[in-house]
Amino acid sequence: MDFWFSEMQTPNVKLSIRVDHQLYSGKSEFQRIDVFESPEFGRFLTLDGYMMLTEKDEFIYHEMITHVPMAVHPKVRDVLVIGAGDGGVIRELTRYPEIEHIDMAEIDPLVVEVCRKYLPQTACRLDDPRLSIYYEDGVRFVRSKENCYDLIIVDSTDPFGPGEGLFTREFYGSCFKALREDGIMVNQHESPFYAADAAACQRAHKRI
């Protein structure tokens, strides 16, 4: 019998990937975490039934969210990454020898644990000596920071569930305060391709 992972995009659109077998399924304090093996995309991670990344194409997202701000800023030394429990953003940041320190605030330690075990392609640099991992809410973490970072990358889930607090005026104000004068902030944002996603983006923007 065929085994497929399917994610509803809208009531009228469903995307499916054939699965060889399931590598992991568990539930943390915050969300359900699953890892699957597929013939077409390799291993892939889902949170609460939503696709987060696949081994085949994760580099596209992680390279773009990291290397564009690194190319723009004249000298990045200190970086804050919020979310990013899969380790892909950290992997890309550690390619830069000029970066002196990276703080990573990830709310769910089980995501990191699972990715270390099942997704070493993305989690391969989570032991870099320049990295400090804090298992706490990114909203709370950044609130106490001031003039600390040259770059903030928010690699979160979409504007619902554990990531909802990262799309508010308060959070963006805290990030502005945490950045140095020439600092840059980059935020993952859901694509407004479908009408329901566009409405969610508009609601998030109104809070900002």
Regions from the language model: what does each represent?
Residues 48-49:
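Short strand-turn-strand beta-turns centered on an Asx-Gly dipeptide
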Residues 2, 53-187, 194-205:
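The AdoMet/dcAdoMet-binding core of the Class I SAM-like
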Residues 1-44:
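N-terminal auxiliary segments of SAM/dcSAM-dependent transferases
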